[in-house]
């Protein structure tokens, strides 16, 4: 099968079909959208063997990991569909007061889908953040049509997933233009899509360079559109001394497993470990060194990532004050990422912005602070993050409110005595954060609230009842939550 880049005319045709289908699909019932998402999940399950086999060949990921990721993807589709039908995200609201003098208008408001959405799949999650992943699921739940640009690192996997979506659309007797799948390894294809005047929003998971480029292209349009890009994070972990004294070995085991999970190719990998000088830190470092040496190198996703990891690691280790204190005792083979553990003083880290950047792969830094004041300086210097973690006793946390306030302003998820890897799919999850972790910190990419990225408010004033959606009509028996005069019914 050919995976050659789409031409400009092919892109035009896809976008035109998507835009035409939006006029109908945007008016579909919530039950219809739920049915579609469940149908996609069902088709993915039917094609499990083919999907996992293709992804294993294209990504070097083990089949156990891929099966677990496919389970997550199926759950996302089903849970987003169920949330869609419950309708809380519509934020239905009615304001009227017949007794008011002078007479006030009747205002009713809800959320409507924005239009065709372009989704750029990620390389490190070929199912959950790719063709049939969370961005596609949440956009379809919102009532938007979707065009997915397949990631060039796993085109066959994406093609199989796309066929599952197309089969589900046919099963539900919906328009084929609801979904389109395009190929393009060149930047040109990505630019054509994001700059097309009929595209209303963009979702992206990947590098800072890629996400920022899409954001800039969208801003250059005559009518700019939102770009929801999840780009990267170093996910700092602050280790307070009392907690470290209690469990240095356990914490080292947790963090060494976390930073090397999936060969360090998780956007939530803990890439900075910050602590104050103390004997417990020495014990922690000794244990981290021992464990890092024992972890074997493994295949990275593709040759491009291996090259970037190797060159970035060499660059970081060459910086002033950076000490390579441990690496895997096994030599890395072709295409493999070797676990690396470095240490640097807070003063050297603060002076060097390069050390603040993400290194995608099994690499982490221990930052040694002289005292609590220096630890606060490190927190102040952090850019936006997907996660920040505090390892502390409760009494330490109570006494560290300034640190906590700093971390709250710099991340989308604040973790207490845990590790950042592992992102639960649930409504309360927020997988996002301030720039440069994402381009819009108000929204997340995981959990049903991800639907909110692709909707906008619309208010109706003095509109005839029979022309309104059922859930905005005065006497509706709808189960959809709604506000009446500011009070939820």
Predicted segments — roles?
Residues 10, 188-189, 374:
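Short acidic active-site motifs
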Residues 36, 144-157, 178, 225-241, ...:
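Short loop-to-beta-strand entry elements in the cores of soluble alpha/beta enzymes
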Residues 45, 89-256, 278-281:
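Rossmann-like NAD(P) dinucleotide-binding subdomain of oxidoreductase/dehydrogenase enzymes
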Residues 334, 372-468:
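C-terminal core of ALDH-fold dehydrogenases
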Residues 457-489:
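Structural signal for terminal/edge beta-strands and the immediately following C-terminal loop/tail
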């Amino acid at each position: 099968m050919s995976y050659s880049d789409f031409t400009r005319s092919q892109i035009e045709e896809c976008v035109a079909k998507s835009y035409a289908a939006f006029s109908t699909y945007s008016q579909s019932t919530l039950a219809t959208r739920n049915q579609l998402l469940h149908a996609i999940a069902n088709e993915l399950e039917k094609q499990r063997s083919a999907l996992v086999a293709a992804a294993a060949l294209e990504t070097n990921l083990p089949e156990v990991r891929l099966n677990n990721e496919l389970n997550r993807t199926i759950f996302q589709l089903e849970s987003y569909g169920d949330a869609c039908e419950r309708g809380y995200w519509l934020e239905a609201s009615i304001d009227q007061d017949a007794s008011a003098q002078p007479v006030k208008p009747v205002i009713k408001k809800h959320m409507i889908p924005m239009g065709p959405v372009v989704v750029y799949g990620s390389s490190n999650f070929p199912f959950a953040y790719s063709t049939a992943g969370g961005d596609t699921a949440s956009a379809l739940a919102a009532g938007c049509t979707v065009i997915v640009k397949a990631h060039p690192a796993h085109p066959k996997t994406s093609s199989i997933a796309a066929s599952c979506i197309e089969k589900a659309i046919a099963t539900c007797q919906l328009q084929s233009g609801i979904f389109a799948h395009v190929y393009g390894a060149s930047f040109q294809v990505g630019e054509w899509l994001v700059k097309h005047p009929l595209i209303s929003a963009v979702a992206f998971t990947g590098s800072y360079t890629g996400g920022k480029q899409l954001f800039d292209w969208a801003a250059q349009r005559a009518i700019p559109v939102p770009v929801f890009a999840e780009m990267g994070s170093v996910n700092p972990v602050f280790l307070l001394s009392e907690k470290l004294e209690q469990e240095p070995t356990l914490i080292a085991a947790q963090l060494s497993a976390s930073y090397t999970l999936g060969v360090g190719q998780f956007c939530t990998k803990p890439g900075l470990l910050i602590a104050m000088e103390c004997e417990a830190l020495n014990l922690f470092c000794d244990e981290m060194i021992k464990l890092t040496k024992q972890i074997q190198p493994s295949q990275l996703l593709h040759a491009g990532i291996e090259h970037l990891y190797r060159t970035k690691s060499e660059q970081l280790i060459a910086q002033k004050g950076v000490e390579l204190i441990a690496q895997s005792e096994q030599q890395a083979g072709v295409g493999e990422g070797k676990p690396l553990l470095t240490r640097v003083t807070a003063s050297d880290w603060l002076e060097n912005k390069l050390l603040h950047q993400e290194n995608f792969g099994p690499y982490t830094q221990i930052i040694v602070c002289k005292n609590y004041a220096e630890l606060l300086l490190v927190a102040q210097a952090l850019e936006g993050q997907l996660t920040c973690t505090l390892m502390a006793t409760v009494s330490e946390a109570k006494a560290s409110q300034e640190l906590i306030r700093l971390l709250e302003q710099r991340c989308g998820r604040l973790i207490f005595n845990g590790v950042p890897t592992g992102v639960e799919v649930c409504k309360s999850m927020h997988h996002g954060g301030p720039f440069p972790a994402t381009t819009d910190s108000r929204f997340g990419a995981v959990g049903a609230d991800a639907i909110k990225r692709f909707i906008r408010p619309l208010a109706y004033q003095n509109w005839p009842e029979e022309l309104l959606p059922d859930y905005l009509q005065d006497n509706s028996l709808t189960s959809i939550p709604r506000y009446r005069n500011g009070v939820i019914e």
